[in-house]
Amino acid sequence: KRLSDADELLPFDCGDEDLNNYLFSDALSYQNQLLSVTYYLDNGDETILFFSLSNDKIAAIELTNGFWRKIKTLFPHSKPRKDYPAVKIGRLGVNVKYQHQEKSWGAFILNYVKQWMVTENKTGCRFITVDAYQSAVPFYLKNGFLFMGSQERVRYEKQKGDTVAMYFDLMQIV
């Protein structure tokens, strides 16, 4: 369900205070300012999960030349561009009670967003991007995301920075 002013969010704790605070304190404000849109699922007693999406791009100016060449090879016979459209998963959280179950709610969200962007998207969108927390990188790798260049892989391997830029090419599921 898309978050709205009329919604009273039910209890939620994903084990990450920053994500919890975002859902209860910032998500609606970001949405009202047209910066992102937050969706959530509850069971009548508690919030099971939420995710926030915003527009993004993969841009040449932000990447190494080698990685940008790799991205451009995905578009043979097309006019060269300086960027390609994407949607960013800005926030994603699953209630601790629903984490590490046989059915992965996190994978469910990613698969839902992937299919949604291919079948229901109102604008062009080739990629899904995420600035993954270091601890979440294995989850995103398992779900088909790649590092946005070798420098991001090194950041992960050396545990530099809080997040690692990753992407998923939606043409993998078309």
Would you name each region that the model predicts?
Residues 130, 140-141, 145:
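Conserved active-site tyrosine of GNAT-family acetyltransferases
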Residues 100-115:
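Conserved acetyl-CoA-binding loop-helix of GNAT-fold acetyltransferases
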Residues 90-102:
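A short, internal acetyl-CoA/4′-phosphopantetheine-binding micro-motif in the GNAT/acyltransferase core
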Residues 52-91, 157:
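Conserved acyl-donor/pantetheine-binding loop and adjacent beta-alpha core of acyl/acetyltransferases
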Residues 124, 131-135, 149-174:
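C-terminal "cap" of GNAT-fold acetyltransferases
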Residues 1-29, 33, 38:
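Short amphipathic alpha-helix that is part of the acyltransferase structural core
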Residues 34-52, 65:
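Conserved beta-hairpin
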Residues 110, 117-132:
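Conserved GNAT acetyl-CoA-binding A-motif
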